[in-house]
Regions:
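A short helix-loop-beta submotif of the ANL/AMP-binding
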Residues: 72-82, 102
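Short acidic, glycine/Ser/Thr-rich loop/turn "cap" segments at secondary-structure junctions
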Residues: 26-28, 52-59, 92-93, 100-103
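Conserved AMP-binding loop of ANL adenylate-forming enzymes
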Residues: 38-73
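Active-site diphosphate/adenylate-binding microenvironment
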Residues: 1-35, 39
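Active-site glycine/GP-rich loop and adjacent strand/helix microenvironment
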Residues: 84-355
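Short, flexible loop segments at the rims of nucleotide/cofactor-binding pockets, characterized by
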Residues: 32-35, 80-84
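Redox-cofactor binding/interface segments in oxidoreductases and associated redox assembly factors
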Residues: 14-15, 57, 106, 136
Length: 355
Protein backbone atom coordinates (compact mmCIF):
# COMPACT_ATOMS: atom_id res chain seq x y z
CA UNK A 1 0.00 0.00 0.00
CA UNK A 2 1.41 3.38 -1.06
CA UNK A 3 0.45 6.42 1.00
CA UNK A 4 0.09 9.69 -0.92
CA UNK A 5 -1.31 13.17 -0.51
CA UNK A 6 -2.57 15.39 -3.30
CA UNK A 7 0.86 17.02 -3.46
CA UNK A 8 2.61 13.70 -4.03
CA UNK A 9 0.28 12.03 -6.57
CA UNK A 10 2.50 11.05 -9.55
CA UNK A 11 1.74 13.18 -12.59
CA UNK A 12 1.76 10.29 -15.06
CA UNK A 13 0.87 10.61 -18.73
CA UNK A 14 -2.20 11.19 -20.87
CA UNK A 15 -5.08 13.42 -19.78
CA UNK A 16 -4.25 15.25 -16.54
CA UNK A 17 -6.81 16.75 -14.18
CA UNK A 18 -5.26 20.01 -13.01
CA UNK A 19 -6.18 21.96 -9.91
CA UNK A 20 -6.93 25.67 -10.55
CA UNK A 21 -3.42 26.63 -9.41
CA UNK A 22 -1.86 23.69 -11.31
CA UNK A 23 -0.24 22.45 -8.09
CA UNK A 24 -1.94 19.06 -8.40
CA UNK A 25 -1.97 17.06 -11.66
CA UNK A 26 -3.81 13.73 -11.52
CA UNK A 27 -3.69 11.28 -14.45
CA UNK A 28 -7.07 10.17 -15.80
CA UNK A 29 -6.98 7.77 -18.73
CA UNK A 30 -10.08 7.29 -20.86
CA UNK A 31 -10.99 4.29 -18.72
CA UNK A 32 -10.34 6.26 -15.51
CA UNK A 33 -12.52 9.13 -16.69
CA UNK A 34 -15.28 6.70 -17.64
CA UNK A 35 -15.00 5.09 -14.19
CA UNK A 36 -15.19 8.53 -12.53
CA UNK A 37 -18.39 9.28 -14.43
CA UNK A 38 -19.90 5.86 -13.69
CA UNK A 39 -19.11 6.07 -9.96
CA UNK A 40 -20.68 9.52 -9.82
CA UNK A 41 -23.75 8.30 -11.71
CA UNK A 42 -24.19 5.43 -9.24
CA UNK A 43 -23.92 7.86 -6.33
CA UNK A 44 -26.54 10.23 -7.73
CA UNK A 45 -28.83 7.26 -8.40
CA UNK A 46 -28.38 6.04 -4.82
CA UNK A 47 -29.18 9.58 -3.62
CA UNK A 48 -32.54 9.38 -5.38
CA UNK A 49 -32.05 11.13 -8.73
CA UNK A 50 -34.24 9.48 -11.39
CA UNK A 51 -35.46 10.04 -14.93
CA UNK A 52 -38.24 12.25 -13.56
CA UNK A 53 -35.68 14.83 -12.40
CA UNK A 54 -34.44 17.83 -14.35
CA UNK A 55 -31.08 18.88 -12.87
CA UNK A 56 -29.10 22.13 -12.97
CA UNK A 57 -25.43 21.94 -11.90
CA UNK A 58 -24.16 25.28 -10.57
CA UNK A 59 -20.47 24.42 -10.11
CA UNK A 60 -17.11 25.25 -11.64
CA UNK A 61 -15.88 22.98 -14.40
CA UNK A 62 -12.19 23.11 -13.54
CA UNK A 63 -10.14 21.58 -10.78
CA UNK A 64 -11.66 20.82 -7.41
CA UNK A 65 -15.36 20.69 -8.26
CA UNK A 66 -15.63 19.30 -11.76
CA UNK A 67 -19.14 20.43 -12.62
CA UNK A 68 -18.80 19.17 -16.18
CA UNK A 69 -17.95 15.65 -14.99
CA UNK A 70 -20.87 15.59 -12.57
CA UNK A 71 -23.19 16.89 -15.30
CA UNK A 72 -22.00 14.10 -17.58
CA UNK A 73 -22.70 11.59 -14.82
CA UNK A 74 -26.22 12.93 -14.38
CA UNK A 75 -26.89 12.83 -18.12
CA UNK A 76 -28.70 9.61 -18.92
CA UNK A 77 -29.79 9.27 -15.30
CA UNK A 78 -31.92 12.40 -15.01
CA UNK A 79 -34.50 13.42 -17.58
CA UNK A 80 -32.57 16.62 -18.35
CA UNK A 81 -29.31 18.19 -17.18
CA UNK A 82 -27.63 21.57 -17.60
CA UNK A 83 -24.33 23.00 -16.33
CA UNK A 84 -24.46 26.75 -15.74
CA UNK A 85 -21.40 27.47 -13.59
CA UNK A 86 -21.36 29.01 -10.11
CA UNK A 87 -21.52 32.75 -10.76
CA UNK A 88 -24.51 34.99 -11.19
CA UNK A 89 -27.58 34.25 -9.04
CA UNK A 90 -29.88 36.02 -11.51
CA UNK A 91 -28.49 33.85 -14.29
CA UNK A 92 -28.98 30.76 -12.14
CA UNK A 93 -32.57 31.76 -11.43
CA UNK A 94 -33.19 32.11 -15.17
CA UNK A 95 -31.55 28.72 -15.80
CA UNK A 96 -33.72 26.99 -13.19
CA UNK A 97 -36.79 28.41 -14.89
CA UNK A 98 -35.63 27.55 -18.43
CA UNK A 99 -34.78 23.95 -17.52
CA UNK A 100 -37.82 23.46 -15.32
CA UNK A 101 -35.42 22.20 -12.69
CA UNK A 102 -36.49 19.82 -9.96
CA UNK A 103 -32.95 19.35 -8.57
CA UNK A 104 -30.01 21.70 -8.06
CA UNK A 105 -26.36 20.72 -7.50
CA UNK A 106 -24.60 23.56 -5.68
CA UNK A 107 -22.27 24.35 -2.77
CA UNK A 108 -23.91 24.92 0.63
CA UNK A 109 -22.90 28.58 0.75
CA UNK A 110 -24.04 28.99 -2.84
CA UNK A 111 -27.47 27.65 -1.89
CA UNK A 112 -27.63 29.91 1.17
CA UNK A 113 -26.63 32.93 -0.92
CA UNK A 114 -29.24 32.09 -3.57
CA UNK A 115 -31.88 31.85 -0.85
CA UNK A 116 -30.92 35.23 0.60
CA UNK A 117 -31.06 36.89 -2.82
CA UNK A 118 -34.42 35.30 -3.62
CA UNK A 119 -35.85 37.00 -0.54
CA UNK A 120 -34.01 40.33 -0.58
CA UNK A 121 -33.32 41.11 -4.25
CA UNK A 122 -35.46 38.99 -6.54
CA UNK A 123 -38.60 38.92 -4.34
CA UNK A 124 -39.21 35.29 -5.30
CA UNK A 125 -40.71 32.69 -2.97
CA UNK A 126 -38.24 29.73 -2.91
CA UNK A 127 -41.18 27.32 -2.89
CA UNK A 128 -42.26 28.66 -6.28
CA UNK A 129 -39.07 27.30 -7.88
CA UNK A 130 -40.44 23.77 -7.64
CA UNK A 131 -37.17 22.21 -6.51
CA UNK A 132 -37.60 18.76 -4.99
CA UNK A 133 -33.93 18.09 -4.22
CA UNK A 134 -30.93 20.21 -3.26
CA UNK A 135 -27.62 18.37 -3.68
CA UNK A 136 -24.89 20.07 -1.66
CA UNK A 137 -21.24 19.44 -2.52
CA UNK A 138 -17.77 20.80 -1.92
CA UNK A 139 -17.90 22.58 1.44
CA UNK A 140 -18.13 22.04 5.16
CA UNK A 141 -21.58 22.99 6.39
CA UNK A 142 -23.78 22.52 9.43
CA UNK A 143 -27.05 20.81 10.18
CA UNK A 144 -28.84 24.10 10.96
CA UNK A 145 -28.10 25.50 7.49
CA UNK A 146 -29.23 22.29 5.81
CA UNK A 147 -32.48 22.19 7.76
CA UNK A 148 -33.13 25.85 6.96
CA UNK A 149 -32.58 25.21 3.24
CA UNK A 150 -34.91 22.19 3.37
CA UNK A 151 -37.67 24.22 5.01
CA UNK A 152 -37.32 27.27 2.75
CA UNK A 153 -37.18 25.35 -0.54
CA UNK A 154 -39.52 22.57 0.55
CA UNK A 155 -36.94 20.11 -0.74
CA UNK A 156 -34.83 17.14 0.31
CA UNK A 157 -31.30 18.28 1.13
CA UNK A 158 -28.72 15.67 0.19
CA UNK A 159 -25.00 15.94 0.83
CA UNK A 160 -22.85 14.30 -1.86
CA UNK A 161 -19.15 13.76 -1.20
CA UNK A 162 -17.05 14.69 -4.24
CA UNK A 163 -13.43 13.73 -3.67
CA UNK A 164 -10.87 16.54 -4.10
CA UNK A 165 -8.39 14.42 -6.08
CA UNK A 166 -10.30 12.82 -8.95
CA UNK A 167 -13.55 14.78 -8.76
CA UNK A 168 -15.73 11.69 -8.41
CA UNK A 169 -18.98 11.66 -6.44
CA UNK A 170 -18.35 8.72 -4.12
CA UNK A 171 -20.87 8.90 -1.28
CA UNK A 172 -24.07 10.60 -0.16
CA UNK A 173 -26.10 11.33 2.98
CA UNK A 174 -29.25 13.03 4.21
CA UNK A 175 -27.67 16.33 5.25
CA UNK A 176 -30.45 17.48 7.59
CA UNK A 177 -29.23 15.23 10.42
CA UNK A 178 -25.56 15.40 11.41
CA UNK A 179 -25.77 11.85 12.76
CA UNK A 180 -26.25 10.46 9.25
CA UNK A 181 -22.95 9.01 7.97
CA UNK A 182 -21.74 9.06 4.40
CA UNK A 183 -22.92 6.10 2.34
CA UNK A 184 -20.24 5.18 -0.23
CA UNK A 185 -21.75 3.80 -3.41
CA UNK A 186 -19.28 0.89 -3.38
CA UNK A 187 -17.25 -0.83 -0.71
CA UNK A 188 -13.59 0.11 -0.41
CA UNK A 189 -13.73 3.66 -1.80
CA UNK A 190 -13.25 5.62 1.43
CA UNK A 191 -11.50 4.98 4.73
CA UNK A 192 -10.33 6.82 7.83
CA UNK A 193 -6.68 7.30 8.74
CA UNK A 194 -4.69 8.42 11.73
CA UNK A 195 -3.59 12.04 11.42
CA UNK A 196 -0.09 11.41 12.72
CA UNK A 197 0.85 8.16 11.00
CA UNK A 198 0.08 6.22 7.84
CA UNK A 199 -2.40 3.77 9.29
CA UNK A 200 -6.03 3.06 8.46
CA UNK A 201 -8.31 3.20 11.50
CA UNK A 202 -10.88 0.46 12.00
CA UNK A 203 -12.50 2.47 14.80
CA UNK A 204 -11.39 5.43 16.89
CA UNK A 205 -14.26 6.83 18.97
CA UNK A 206 -13.54 10.22 20.48
CA UNK A 207 -10.75 11.00 18.01
CA UNK A 208 -10.34 12.99 14.84
CA UNK A 209 -9.39 11.11 11.69
CA UNK A 210 -8.53 12.04 8.12
CA UNK A 211 -10.67 10.90 5.24
CA UNK A 212 -8.58 8.93 2.72
CA UNK A 213 -9.31 7.62 -0.76
CA UNK A 214 -8.64 4.05 -1.82
CA UNK A 215 -9.17 4.37 -5.60
CA UNK A 216 -9.26 0.70 -6.55
CA UNK A 217 -10.99 1.69 -9.80
CA UNK A 218 -8.01 3.77 -11.05
CA UNK A 219 -5.65 2.21 -13.59
CA UNK A 220 -2.36 3.39 -12.04
CA UNK A 221 -3.27 4.48 -8.50
CA UNK A 222 -5.43 1.52 -7.53
CA UNK A 223 -3.03 0.38 -4.78
CA UNK A 224 -2.62 3.86 -3.26
CA UNK A 225 -4.16 5.39 -0.17
CA UNK A 226 -4.52 9.13 -0.73
CA UNK A 227 -5.00 11.66 2.05
CA UNK A 228 -7.72 14.21 1.23
CA UNK A 229 -6.95 16.85 3.86
CA UNK A 230 -10.52 16.47 5.17
CA UNK A 231 -11.05 15.57 8.83
CA UNK A 232 -13.98 13.92 10.58
CA UNK A 233 -14.78 13.89 14.28
CA UNK A 234 -15.59 10.45 15.66
CA UNK A 235 -17.91 10.40 18.64
CA UNK A 236 -18.47 7.42 20.87
CA UNK A 237 -21.62 6.51 18.94
CA UNK A 238 -20.29 7.26 15.44
CA UNK A 239 -21.47 4.77 12.85
CA UNK A 240 -19.73 4.57 9.50
CA UNK A 241 -17.89 7.58 8.08
CA UNK A 242 -19.20 10.97 9.23
CA UNK A 243 -19.23 14.01 6.96
CA UNK A 244 -16.01 16.09 7.16
CA UNK A 245 -16.04 18.90 9.71
CA UNK A 246 -12.47 20.23 9.39
CA UNK A 247 -9.49 20.41 7.06
CA UNK A 248 -5.80 19.82 7.73
CA UNK A 249 -2.57 20.10 5.80
CA UNK A 250 -1.23 22.44 3.14
CA UNK A 251 -4.57 23.22 1.48
CA UNK A 252 -7.41 25.27 2.94
CA UNK A 253 -10.98 25.12 1.62
CA UNK A 254 -12.54 28.47 0.64
CA UNK A 255 -15.84 28.69 -1.27
CA UNK A 256 -15.53 25.09 -2.37
CA UNK A 257 -12.04 25.60 -3.81
CA UNK A 258 -8.78 24.34 -2.33
CA UNK A 259 -6.14 27.03 -1.87
CA UNK A 260 -2.54 25.78 -1.87
CA UNK A 261 -0.77 27.41 1.07
CA UNK A 262 2.74 26.51 -0.18
CA UNK A 263 1.95 28.23 -3.49
CA UNK A 264 0.65 31.31 -1.69
CA UNK A 265 3.73 31.44 0.54
CA UNK A 266 6.02 31.06 -2.46
CA UNK A 267 4.55 33.90 -4.54
CA UNK A 268 4.40 36.30 -1.59
CA UNK A 269 7.98 35.46 -0.60
CA UNK A 270 9.11 36.86 -3.97
CA UNK A 271 7.72 40.31 -3.18
CA UNK A 272 10.36 42.43 -1.50
CA UNK A 273 9.27 44.35 1.57
CA UNK A 274 6.60 42.05 3.02
CA UNK A 275 7.42 41.56 6.69
CA UNK A 276 4.49 39.34 7.59
CA UNK A 277 1.02 38.40 6.44
CA UNK A 278 -2.15 36.81 7.74
CA UNK A 279 -4.83 35.07 5.70
CA UNK A 280 -8.13 35.61 7.49
CA UNK A 281 -11.16 33.52 6.47
CA UNK A 282 -14.65 34.26 7.75
CA UNK A 283 -18.21 33.17 7.10
CA UNK A 284 -20.20 35.97 8.69
CA UNK A 285 -23.03 35.88 6.15
CA UNK A 286 -23.84 33.34 3.48
CA UNK A 287 -20.43 33.17 1.75
CA UNK A 288 -16.81 32.68 2.79
CA UNK A 289 -14.81 35.91 2.80
CA UNK A 290 -11.00 35.76 2.61
CA UNK A 291 -8.74 38.71 3.41
CA UNK A 292 -4.96 38.81 3.10
CA UNK A 293 -3.61 41.25 5.68
CA UNK A 294 -0.12 42.40 4.71
CA UNK A 295 2.41 44.24 6.88
CA UNK A 296 5.22 45.97 4.98
CA UNK A 297 8.71 46.48 6.32
CA UNK A 298 9.26 49.98 4.86
CA UNK A 299 7.16 53.17 5.16
CA UNK A 300 7.59 53.89 1.44
CA UNK A 301 5.51 50.82 0.59
CA UNK A 302 2.47 51.65 2.72
CA UNK A 303 0.86 53.83 0.06
CA UNK A 304 2.67 52.49 -2.99
CA UNK A 305 -0.04 51.39 -5.49
CA UNK A 306 2.44 49.42 -7.59
CA UNK A 307 3.46 47.26 -4.61
CA UNK A 308 -0.14 46.78 -3.57
CA UNK A 309 -0.92 45.72 -7.14
CA UNK A 310 1.91 43.20 -7.08
CA UNK A 311 0.38 41.55 -4.02
CA UNK A 312 -3.08 41.41 -5.62
CA UNK A 313 -1.67 39.94 -8.83
CA UNK A 314 0.35 37.35 -6.92
CA UNK A 315 -2.77 36.19 -5.07
CA UNK A 316 -4.82 36.05 -8.27
CA UNK A 317 -2.14 33.85 -9.84
CA UNK A 318 -2.57 31.04 -7.31
CA UNK A 319 -6.35 30.82 -6.87
CA UNK A 320 -9.59 31.67 -8.65
CA UNK A 321 -11.10 32.56 -5.27
CA UNK A 322 -11.46 36.29 -4.64
CA UNK A 323 -9.15 37.30 -1.80
CA UNK A 324 -9.24 40.90 -0.62
CA UNK A 325 -5.82 42.46 0.07
CA UNK A 326 -5.62 44.75 3.08
CA UNK A 327 -2.40 46.67 3.78
CA UNK A 328 -1.91 47.26 7.49
CA UNK A 329 -1.38 50.94 8.33
CA UNK A 330 1.79 50.48 10.38
CA UNK A 331 5.25 49.27 9.41
CA UNK A 332 6.41 45.98 10.89
CA UNK A 333 10.05 46.16 11.91
CA UNK A 334 10.32 42.42 12.45
CA UNK A 335 9.51 39.53 10.15
CA UNK A 336 7.18 36.75 11.23
CA UNK A 337 5.91 33.47 9.74
CA UNK A 338 2.62 33.56 7.82
CA UNK A 339 -0.57 33.01 9.83
CA UNK A 340 -3.77 31.27 8.71
CA UNK A 341 -6.61 32.70 10.80
CA UNK A 342 -9.69 30.61 10.02
CA UNK A 343 -12.51 32.28 11.94
CA UNK A 344 -14.90 29.57 10.69
CA UNK A 345 -13.01 27.04 12.82
CA UNK A 346 -12.55 24.70 9.85
CA UNK A 347 -8.79 24.50 9.26
CA UNK A 348 -6.80 22.73 11.96
CA UNK A 349 -3.38 23.73 10.62
CA UNK A 350 -0.72 22.49 8.24
CA UNK A 351 0.93 20.08 10.67
CA UNK A 352 -0.96 16.79 10.92
CA UNK A 353 1.43 15.51 13.57
CA UNK A 354 0.52 18.33 15.93
CA UNK A 355 -3.12 17.20 16.01
Amino acid sequence: MTWLSRDTVPTGTGFLRLSPAADVAVPLSSADLAATVELSRETFAAAGITATDRVVVALNSDGDLAGAVLTQALTGLAGATASVGPRGRMRLLAALDAVGATALVITPTGAADLLARLHMEFLVDPLDLGLRTLILVGEITDQRTCRHLAAEFGARVIGVYVDPVFGAALAWRDATDERNPLSPVRDGLLALADLAEDAVLAAAPGKSAELVLTPVWHSTLGDATIRTGEVVDLSADSAGIPAPTHTVGDHVLIRGRWLSLPRLRAVLAKIDGIAQWTLEIRRDGTLDVATLKVAFARPSLLKNPMWHGRVRQAVAAVTPVTIKVEVLPEVSETSAPPVIDDRRGHHLGSDRHGR
